[in-house]
């Protein structure tokens, strides 16, 4: 990341940099950084370098904070993929208790946000605060178990999951729902794909 910023510092046309954060940077709420995992801690650490370069080379930046992403053609297996994999599986998939309340956002909404930023980059450059965070989610929380039930309802198949077979990690995020009011007030943007519709779309691509 720092190498990228160093290269971009030689680009005089750079006006806006879009950083990507993680909801796991806010284990105890969005008021302060408290990373749940090492990965999210590196995201928080990078912000210091980004702020330094932005001040030194006078460019604007924002941070997009995706919540629990699903859909598309994932390069890594995500939470929802494990649930889908359990459908009518002969052997039960071991998971935690599934009580986490998460905000599931379809990858198409993430893409739409990035396109929106590109199309409206001048407006983002005029934001009063440099380094503004935009939390990308629907603003609605759903437990992992509830997601499994929706998947069963949509697919007409049964999830074979052994709930509680795995322990929660010591700093697991148990509640992560995007605060979306700022998105609506500052940039007039919100996610469009409801969870059930997104799951239907995702299952149809399987």
Please describe what each predicted stretch is.
Residues 18-22, 65-67, 99, 137:
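Active-site beta-alpha turn of Rossmann-fold NAD(P)-dependent dehydrogenases/reductases
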Residues 38, 42-45:
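Active-site helix of classical SDR
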Residues 51-102, 107-118, 150-152:
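NAD(P)-dependent short-chain dehydrogenase/reductase
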Residues 130-134, 143-148, 156-175:
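C-terminal "lid/loop" region of Rossmann-like NAD(P)-dependent oxidoreductases
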Residues 1-8, 49-50, 113, 117:
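Hydrophobic positions on the long internal alpha-helix
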Residues 107, 133, 167-197, 201:
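Conserved C-terminal active-site "lid" loop/helix of NAD(P)H-dependent oxidoreductases
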Residues 2-38:
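Conserved Rossmann-fold NAD(P)-dependent oxidoreductase catalytic core, especially the SDR/UDP-sugar
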Residues 68-69, 93-94, 102, 114, ...:
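A recurrent short beta-strand within the Rossmann-like NAD(P)-dependent oxidoreductase core
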């Amino acid at each position: 990341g720092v190498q990228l910023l160093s290269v971009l510092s030689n680009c005089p046309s750079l006006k806006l940099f879009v950083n990507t954060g993680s909801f796991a940077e806010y284990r105890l709420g969005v008021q302060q950084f408290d990373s749940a995992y090492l990965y999210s801690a590196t995201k928080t650490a990078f912000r210091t370098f980004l702020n330094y370069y932005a001040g030194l080379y006078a460019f604007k930046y924002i941070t997009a904070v995706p919540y629990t992403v699903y859909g598309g053609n994932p390069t890594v297996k995500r939470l929802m993929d494990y649930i889908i994999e359990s459908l009518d599986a002969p052997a039960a998939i071991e998971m935690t208790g599934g009580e986490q309340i998460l905000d599931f956002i379809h990858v198409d909404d993430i893409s739409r946000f990035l396109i929106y930023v590109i199309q409206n980059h001048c407006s983002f450059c005029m934001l009063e605060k440099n380094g503004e965070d935009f939390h990308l989610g629907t603003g609605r929380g759903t437990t992992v178990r509830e997601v499994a039930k929706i998947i069963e309802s949509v697919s007409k198949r049964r999830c074979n999951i052994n709930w509680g077979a795995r322990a929660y990690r010591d700093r697991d995020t148990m509640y992560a729902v995007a605060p979306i009011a700022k998105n609506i007030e500052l940039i007039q943007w919100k996610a469009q794909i409801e969870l059930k519709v997104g799951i239907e779309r995702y299952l149809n691509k399987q």
